[in-house]
Amino acid sequence: MGSFNTSFEDGFILVGFSDWPQLEPILFVFIFIFYSLTLFGNTIIIALSWLDLRLHTPMYFFLSHLSLLDLCFTTSTVPQLLINLCGVDRTITRGGCVAQLFIYLALGSTECVLLVVMAFDRYAAVCRPLHYMAIMHPHLCQTLAIASWGAGFVNSLIQTGLAMAMPLCGHRLNHFFCEMPVFLKLACADTEGTEAKMFVARVIVVAVPAALILGSYVHIAHAVLRVKSTAGRRKAFGTCGSHLLVVFLFYGSAIYTYLQSIHNYSEREGKFVALFYTIITPILNPLIYTLRNKDVKGALWKVLWRGRDSG
């Protein structure tokens, strides 16, 4: 059997949710609605971050990057999934599969790193308020954003390269998109060495950022407890709790998928877990981080009234 870059010229078959045909129409409706709302919500955040000068702050700078990531991240898999659920075409070309694997891993890895940067930004705002603007100056913000994107794409390049070097036995991918654990399941040769290399990269990109975020929020919680106002503490803990919910869903599902042994990985369960970080998290991010925020609501009304007056 040849290696991935010479095998299966006709591509792969994505099994998707065809094992549950009665579930496919329901999934199609819900996923289509969630995808539409994700596009709408994240596009609004990006537009407002550019249009309203009051949102030209470090926090909204990173949030606009997160929204762009979520737009691209969900678009790298969901359109293919919707086609799959319709049963029109369950195939994907070899080149398309490689491109999807690379883009998906790059964007997912970038989001893992960017969420750490955003946690650091919140830590600086809450725990070092007097020095916040000095710490989070524009040059540092741009550097951190570029570093996040760079780290994500480097990680994806490494893991995609390792995947392409594996010989595969079969062309049926028991998933709704080209995901790494499914390729490892198809590998003909012993993948222990490849798995070890991938595991190190995943610990750096997934586990370490998750630990850093939790550490940041421990410091934030400690600072909030010193706030004398009960209402202020309640508001701060409510915000932190919402942020941690997104972190838990995103990193929890990613850890389940990427940090367990391939021998313990269940393809049937993996498909449903993947829905959390491909469908659920991208729609929660704009709702939790920004659309409930008074500044964002004010900016949105300002833009809407400006458009109404000009009309």
Swiss-Prot record:
The chain crosses the membrane at residues 26-49, 58-79, 101-120, 140-158, 195-218, 236-258, 272-291. It comes from the Eukaryota. It holds the Pfam family 7tm_4. Residues 50-57, 121-139, 219-235, 292-311 are cytoplasmic. It is found in: Cell membrane. InterPro entries: GPCR_Rhodpsn, GPCR_Rhodpsn_7TM, Olfact_rcpt. This is Olfactory receptor 2Y1. It comes from Homo sapiens (Human).
